Design a protein with these regions (language model features):
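Active-site donor-binding segments of glycosyltransferases and PAPS-dependent sulfotransferases
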Residues: 21-93
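Donor nucleotide-sugar binding/catalytic pocket of nucleotide-sugar-dependent glycosyltransferases
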Residues: 112, 136-189
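Conserved donor-binding/catalytic core segment of Leloir-type glycosyltransferases
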Residues: 189-226
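Nucleotide-activated donor-binding/catalytic signature segment of Leloir-type glycosyltransferases, i.e.
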Residues: 235-260
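Acidic donor-binding loop of glycosyltransferase active sites
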Residues: 263-275, 288
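Short hydrophobic beta-strand element within catalytic cores of glycosyltransferases
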Residues: 289-294, 299-302
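A charged, aromatic-enriched C-terminal amphipathic alpha-helix characteristic of glycosyltransferases
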Residues: 319, 333-363
């Protein structure tokens, strides 16, 4: 059970690998609007969808039906299955299962905009005042109540990082086992000879904080920055870089082009607070060190150390342009970062290790039903 299929991104890569571990699995989602050229990872499976799929304007505005999603996910009849795996960052774990079934929920994150990020979500959505704001607050209140209740229907929680495991404990009062997401490190080639530019790459959305990276480099004209990615904030990023000849905005690029820039970059700069964060791991797979905002999943995936034989990057403590700029100075003064160490660290998050860990944890839940609840 996955929430929605609208593009092939991080959570869909997890689903892809779950399907490889359990190739006989049937697939359910609230909506499925994947383009034909993005469906390959489903292996020809038909996705069974909810009534939201057929509602007006669902293709482009399915998120507007958030208040209906708890009802929709509860309508799936999964009673014929011994094992149910939900891929959850919103409502997927709310599927109804019986006492004779095992429900394992792989949690990318609890529904952040209903919990600790509610106020940020309302602010960035322009829903701080007025009738719509109060309707949104009421909807999120009831969503929290539902989200808490449905946690009781999960037999075993899997978290995509220690950071998310702490969120699960805080939100649901449940322990979880950490199974890091699969990163296709084999797709990336380690390069030892680096060029004299820095790379930032992500979707251009507010929480990624791409503007602060561009602002930082605009104030350092002697240092080169390449920016890859597309999204709602792209025009803002372009405007910030308009008078900075040292900042090159490439927009969307293919994975092959991104991998090439990652391998050649002096360092990868990352300013988001992510629950896991795949791109910093991909950069390390290229032998490229990471300069990251020190919060969230990067504290588990990037190794900061005074020992050059152990370190793969360093952190800055505030999401500001000044903090990024100071981190660049610190990085350049730190001395050598070894590509081999970066690559070895990235291997901890390989597809092979994900499959092994997932299989072990699910088999454990199936084998010991009387003690599987955590």
């Amino acid at each position: 059970m996955h929430e929605w299929f609208v593009n092939y991104a991080g959570s869909e890569k997890v689903v892809e690998e779950i399907l490889k571990v359990f190739p006989q699995a049937d697939l359910f989602a609230l909506v499925d609007f994947l383009a034909d050229d993005e469906r390959g990872f489903l292996g020809g499976r038909r996705v069974r969808t909810s009534f939201i799929q057929r509602l007006p304007k669902a293709r482009n505005a399915f998120r507007n039906y958030l208040p209906l999603m708890p009802l929709a996910v509860e309508q799936f009849d999964l009673s014929a299955y011994d094992l149910v795996i939900s891929s959850n960052h919103a409502v997927a774990k709310g599927v109804i299962t019986g006492p004779g079934q095992v429900h394992v929920s792989y949690v990318h994150t609890p529904i952040r905009y209903a919990w600790d990020l509610q106020h940020q979500y309302l602010r960035e959505s322009g829903l701080e005042k007025g009738l719509k704001a109060w309707i949104a607050r009421l909807s999120l209140h009831y969503l929290r109540l539902w989200d808490s209740r449905t946690a009781h229907g999960v037999d075993a929680f899997l978290a995509n990082s220690e950071y998310v495991a702490r969120r699960i404990r805080k939100t649901y009062g449940r322990d979880s086992k950490v199974v890091y997401p699969p990163v296709d490190v084999a797709r990336f080639t380690m390069r030892t000879g680096k060029e004299d530019f820095y790379l930032a790459a992500s979707r251009m959305v507010p929480y990624k904080r791409m503007p602060i990276i561009v602002e930082a480099f605009a104030a350092m004209p002697e240092r080169q920055l390449v920016v890859i990615g597309d999204g709602p904030e792209l025009e803002r990023v372009k405007a910030l870089a308009r008078d900075a000849s040292n900042v090159k905005i490439l927009g969307y690029q293919s994975t092959e082009v991104l991998a090439d820039y990652m391998a050649r970059a002096r360092a990868f700069v990352f300013a988001a607070e992510e629950d896991f964060g795949i791109t910093p791991v991909e950069a390390q797979a290229c032998g490229t060190p990471v300069i990251a905002y020190g919060a969230g999943g990067v504290l588990e995936t990037v190794m900061s150390s005074a020992d050059s034989k152990k370190r793969t990057g360093l952190f800055f403590r505030n999401q500001t342009a000044d903090a990024v700029r100071n981190a660049i100075y610190e990085f350049e003064a730190a001395g050598e970062f070894q590509p081999e160490v970066c690559r070895a660290n990235a291997e901890r998050f390989s597809v092979k290790k994900f499959r092994q860990r997932l299989h072990q944890t699910v088999e454990s839940a199936l084998a010991t039903p009387e003690g599987r609840r955590q």
